[in-house]
Amino acid sequence: MLDPITSSKALERMVTKHGEKGLLRKYYRFRPARFYGGIATADAVGCNLNCAFCWVKEPRLKPWKYGEFYSPGEVASKLEEIARRGRFSKVRVSGAEPTIGREHLVELINVIDKDLLFILETNGMLIGYDESYAREFVGKNVYVRVALKGASSEEFALLTNAKPEFYDYQIKALENLEKYGISYRPALMTFSKNIQGLKERLEKVSPGLSEEIEIEELMLFPHVKKELEKKNIL
Ligand code: SF4
């Protein structure tokens, strides 16, 4: 089973490299997207989990094969241009785990137009592992959406192929964001009918947080259906 922290370190070596314009990271696409009422989106490669329901396949599973390296400034310019054309007020990095390559992400948030809200969609592993990551967002126009993979550590392991104990880092990420006063919200992908245990954990992070869970939409692409059937989830 996967150790997401060790795998993040290996992935970082693969999907980032130092250049004259800072730490470059690999992206395979830049596009407008319909979510959040319209958002400029940069799709990166590589993730530290392997979710059975993940809509991204090849660029996530073969990050060495897909994408080109871009500096934070280049990504910011592309996102600003898409946002300007679509009249969007929000930007995000999707398609992968954006927290891999911390120096790149932090610089991207620093250089992008401050009027654009940066929505950080993350599985929270690295923010839960190291609380100083959450501190990087203090004073920034950032909103963090932590996507919880399952309602328990057992479901997390089944869905992500990672060791069950790493589920705690997802909850810890919420705690760290709460501690530093960062704007955040938990999202949840679950096939469980009972999420009471999770709700109790969230209430300990912040009273009322369990009422703010956003239930994620399952996009049943053929490869997703196949993966879920393989695990007897569907
Ligand atoms: S954490 Fe997100 S990008 Fe990574 S495998 Fe899971 S759904 Fe896909």
State the predicted function of each range:
Residues A52-W55, P63-Y66, E103-L105, D130-S132:
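Short, conserved acidic/polar surface loops in the N-terminal third of protein domains
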Residues A42, Y70, E103:
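Conserved active-site and cofactor/substrate-binding residues in soluble primary-metabolism enzymes
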Residues M1-N48, A52, V56-W64:
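N-terminal [4Fe-4S]-dependent radical SAM core
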Residues I39, W64-G67, E97, A162:
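Pocket-edge positions in alpha/beta enzyme catalytic cores
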Residues E80-K90, G95-I213, L218:
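Conserved AdoMet/S-adenosylmethionine-binding subsite of the radical SAM
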Residues S210-L234:
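C-terminal accessory extensions appended to soluble enzyme cores
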Residues E58-V91:
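Conserved alpha-helical substructure of the radical SAM core
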